[in-house]
Amino acid sequence: MSRIGKKPIPVPSGVTASIEGQLIKAKGPKGELSYIVNDEVLVKLEDNIVSVTPRDQSKDARSKWGMSHSMIRNIFCGVKDGFEKKLEISGVGYRAALQGKNIQLSLGFSHDVVYKVPSDVSVAVPKPTEIVVSGIDKQKVGQIAAEIRGYRGPEPYKGKGIKYVDESLVRKEGKKK
């Protein structure tokens, strides 16, 4: 079992943190985030160090302990540096373009796919075959990147489709005669 929750979480420089009951708020140069910690977990802020402890030694409390630690660390990283996911489009005629706040994707369908981007996440298209999703909330950035990838995931034979830049594809061999 991982003991990630035992490590104290230092509040980064440039970030202010406050705890009100089970609500922890972080404010930094990129914005402001808050997280409601589960009732099974106690959170304390002392001298710019956040410590997370389970209320008791039940299995549920210990599992929420590590998750709460990771979520608090992620909101600190998000308001300080932000998060970013890069997507790569490969395939003949597959491309992306930015239309105001929306992304227009040409993915080999009979129509173009238009994805509406939420206001708290920014999307850039530096090249027609590259999409960069960035924001302060790690969950939302990952969710939007996964939704865009879901329109045309990479296929195993030619590798056409949308994939993460750091994703490795398992390629298959075509059938033999």
Swiss-Prot record:
Keywords: Ribonucleoprotein, Ribosomal protein, RNA-binding, rRNA-binding. The keyword rRNA-binding applies. PROSITE patterns: RIBOSOMAL_L6_1. GO terms for molecular function: rRNA binding; structural constituent of ribosome. One of its GO terms (cellular component) is cytosolic large ribosomal subunit. One of its GO terms (biological process) is cytoplasmic translation. Part of the 50S ribosomal subunit. This protein binds to the 23S rRNA, and is important in its secondary structure. It is located near the subunit interface in the base of the L7/L12 stalk, and near the tRNA binding site of the peptidyltransferase center. Belongs to the universal ribosomal protein uL6 family. NCBIfam families: L6_bact. HAMAP family: Ribosomal_uL6_B (MF_01365_B). This is Large ribosomal subunit protein uL6. It comes from Bartonella bacilliformis (strain ATCC 35685 / KC583 / Herrer 020/F12,63). The gene is rplF.
